[in-house]
Amino acid sequence: MALDTPSSDLPVSTDDTAEHQPTPAHRPPSAADRRSVDLLEKIRRPRGFGAGAPKIAGTVVGVLAGIALLSSIFPLFRRLIHYPRDFIDNYIVSLPNTSLAWAFVLALVAIALSSRKRIAWWIATIYLVLFMVSNALLLVDPVATDFGVDTDERIQIWIGLGIDAAALIFLIVTYRQFYTRVRRGALFRALGVLIVGLTAATLVGWGLVWAWPGSLERTERLPYAFNRVVTFGSIDSRTFDGHHTHIVIDSALGLLGALALIAAATVLFRSQRLESLMTSDDEKLIRALITRFNDDDSLAYFSTRRDKAVVFSPDGRAAITYRVEIGVGLAGGDPIGDPESWPDAIAEFLTLCDRYGWHPAAMGSSARGAAAYDAAGFGSLSIGDEAILHTREYTISGPAMKAVRQAVTRTRRAGVTVRIRRHGEVPDDEMPQVIARADAWRDTDEERGFAMALSRLGDRADDDCLLVEAVEHAGTPEEKVIGMLSFVPWGRRGVSLDVMRRDRGSVNGVVETMVTELCRNSEQFGITEISLNFATFRAFFEQGPQIGAGPIMRLGYSVLMFGSRFFQMESLYKSNAKYLPDWQPRFLCFEDNRILPRVGLAAIVTEGFVQLPRFGRKQHYIAGQSSIPAGVDADALIAQLESEEDRTAVEVHRPEQVRVRVAKLDRLIEEGFDPYPPADAPTHTIAEAIAEPEGTQVTIAGRVTKMRDFGKVTFADVHDWSGQIQMLVEASRVIPGTPDFGSDVDLGDLVEARGVIGRSRSGELSVLIDAWRFNGKCLRPLPDKWSGLTDPEARVRQRYVDLAINPRSRELLATRSVVVKALRDFLADRGFMEVETPILQQIHGGANATPFQTHINAYNLDLYLRIAPELYLKRLCVGGVEKVFEIGRNFRNEGVDFSHNPEFTSLEAYAAHSDYLKMLDLTREMIQHAATAAHGEPVIIRVDDEGNEQRVDISGDWPVRTVHEVVSEGAGVEITSDTEVSELRGICDRLEIAYRPDWDAGQIVLELYEHLGEDRTTVPTFYTDFPTSTSPLTRAHRSKPGVAERWDLVAWGVELGTAYTELTDPVEQRKRLTAQSILAADGDPEAMELDEDFLTALEYAMPPTGGLGVGVDRVVMLITGQSIRESLAFPMVKPTDA
């Protein structure tokens, strides 16, 4: 039973001291990272004298705002606090008994003070000074006399002045803690709204006071309304001789003033946001950054959303787009642009947050982006997963996709088709209809989304976006669009879902059909990946209802299920999960756990789940001033980014020697020479030229492998496949207009030259050149000619270089060609027909081996690369082809060593009216024939321990031994086909040979054979009569029970081939393959699957047949004495970056 721990219940959670979830490749922290950490720490825990002053000031003013609000709303509360409130109102700070406007003002100031706004400090300081001056005047005659200030009131005024003075001193000494600014806004416009609003409210209030004057005189009514609406009741009541209206009217007057203030504040805040939004220049640069750097970011395009602000790194190569809600600067997704500049962009974002007193956060970051924020000191929380579909792997077949398959089938039967277009292909007169449908089908008043929504359907700047529509009765007068999906570009090969809508009255399954059709037609649009919706807290929905889920997981699941009644979180998860997507985690990054609730609320607001008052604010706009850093030329930077992208596609890092050769190449082209001309066939190979008498004119072509430049004359060794010869190039003999051979030719260059056969002064046979040209300029230097490629790994990886400089490698390649041709000719001369059978197969069979798997998109079908052609060749035998063979490639997903390669060449041959003994003679003679073709006699090459090559004669008959005979000899006891499993296990234990407990006697004998027979074999030897259980395609021995008519050919520990008397009994074959398929179903990757088509063919009767299979690569190894790496032109090698 699993223990429930927080780590197993929670998707991801961190605090300030815990390790964060994303773990990027560790790199030293950059200066920008250190700066970000310092800034974040400053935002979290302000330093310096009076660091807590803003919070204290904000709290005090906030308490006063709460008292003012409660006093304005609840009469009982107003009566309970009458005396202390009256003292505060008269002697410390204005606190009228009813004024919603003043409560609103105090609340704004409290929030601004706690956010360290300097303007709030000025407001509070100036207000205190003015309030103190007005109260101090009451201590001075004749004002004191006019207002009837007595001794008791003087004492209270002095007490109030003392409290205000202390507060003023507190604000002055903590001035530096109030350093944050406010964003630029339309101050005069907001002031105009305030003046108009307060004037209108005063006039309305005057009317109310006139209608219900209470004890007010006619001349007092307008000033009284002004006092309550505009000055929030700050004018001393004694001004009106204690006269007042009804308390309800007072509350109404305060409410009117509050409404005017709210309207003005809304205009100011709205203008602040508008002034900070990205401009068209910002968007242009962001698009260039996305194109250059964010190919792998599925949310990058949403950074062009125009109701976001943007901050760039100082070099302009990275940016963060964000929005401010409830004092949280919320970035959307990962930073945009060059990852090398991400730390600088994050530092600039934190600087901005620090300047304006925002709490920084980022929503929807990928693991890579969260790692960048992690390096800057942020915490992170996994908030869900993004659903990614890989179009080449997407299929609606299989039990897991039943629901989607049924939905698609239902929709197609209803006559629904799918239309897919780029937005740029939608006519201008049709796009408004698309937008209208999207608005009509939206189930909320406002468009939701922030990190994964663009919120501007139909903008011509987004012509690359993809529109998928479900259409009923397409092409008829009744044509009707009933569903739509809109996707934004995701790099070059993907799209991300932006809009999903459908007509609620349409048939169910419209969305599933659109998604499926997009995947099916993805290749037409160059799409390989589709990003669908975001599933919030997927781990809870996936694991919460499961048996064994812990209490925290279950509690979280219950809470989210309750929330899903309002926000459709569970339905969104299920709508994604049914496509079996690849889930990519997304993170919420934040400064501090203590601020997490506020960040969460800001995220909910930005996503549109909670609507704050907007007062007619438009949805789409670009305003404000550009955020591109001073000193950055945006047009020049965009041009640079575009050129970088072009260079990235073609340029690679080149060593110095290569750069020198490339420079020489450029110079030759500028001088009019073609280093890569069309073909002009030479008249002679080098071998033919060597055979010609002196004085013969020849034209040869080859690669320069050695040069000796003596100024006026240059000697160069040139070779082609046939041989090598010296070229003598004398400047005086070469026709004019030819490049300078000594300075322009490098080792490795391909040249073609004309001259006569002659000799140098030292007597060496040479071609005396009178004209030459380049056939190909070699841009990389060749290894040393004498030592060549000394690293065996390099010889394999750069086989082309090895062949160019190593005659032995060319000889081995030629020998392989001779051997393969000899094998083919040997069988053809004996009446065998060569055929070709499929390499892509639906069933893997013909041998016990692990196959490679692939997929065909056209049929949406999983396929295997063949492990053997046997079953198809046997079909031909059923069809009457009496002698047949194939030389071709097979593929087995197994190990790589000196004798194994995942892809290899095999020869399989079948002869009717034959058996395994006849195939034994045929195989021996065939290999002897191939050895004779390679070496002129039936010998093979063996390399001894000292590296010396020895020729071994393989003529005549080869040893033939039974498997049980060699196993008995090696074990020291007699082993037969009747030996019990327990006895065989005892022998293995004694010899320390490992075996599996579920093996039968035949499999244990086979394991003993591999250790005691095969591994110890030297000269070519046939081992016959294998246990029947290990040979499912082989006929049982005609006279020996328990064994099959099969042999293996082994030489020096390597199996070269095998042959059977083929099993032609369809009933017995079905039993054996059924047993193999059961093993495959139980998880044995090497067991054969049941090939029903082959069994059906066998039921048509196949003549008695002998079959053989020989590894061509291993025969080449045997004949040449080399490993499989040297025997193959291009063996499989591990990638250099693996």
Curated annotation (Swiss-Prot):
Mg(2+) 1 binds at residues 1048, 1055. Binds 3 Mg(2+) ions per subunit. Disulfide bonds: none annotated. Its cofactor is Mg(2+). Residues 698-772 bind DNA. Coiled coil: none annotated. This is Lysylphosphatidylglycerol biosynthesis bifunctional protein LysX. It comes from Gordonia bronchialis (strain ATCC 25592 / DSM 43247 / BCRC 13721 / JCM 3198 / KCTC 3076 / NBRC 16047 / NCTC 10667) (Rhodococcus bronchialis). The gene is lysX.
